[in-house]
């Protein structure tokens, strides 16, 4: 007999301990995936009216949420909810950390956010010449300071003033 079996006796389903009373208990097991924050990366345009919401997936529902630089943005989070709203204040990178406080040794989920002004614009036209007095559709693509293309949802706050010089 090994040492572990000597220390804690085991009983089969048919054996009893003869305690003089029944021992009954219940155990509820709930399997929960580790918390996850989506998206893992987002670049947002620096504008005081801009807000971006991260989604918290899985986990117990009770989280500790933090950002690594409150000078760059404000974090809006209500305990028990599954969304984190970020309001930018200054340009720069932020790390958003979400830890499940109900699950011991759970993995911390991290998302990165870049708050950026437009670093570069690309203008695409179907042709190179336009006749005087006519019009042409152009496509403008904006990139952040690290060269990432802004997602479509960020263009609503950008005011492009494109001037054309006719020679």
Residue ranges and their predicted role:
Residues 1-167:
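Extracytoplasmic soluble-region selector
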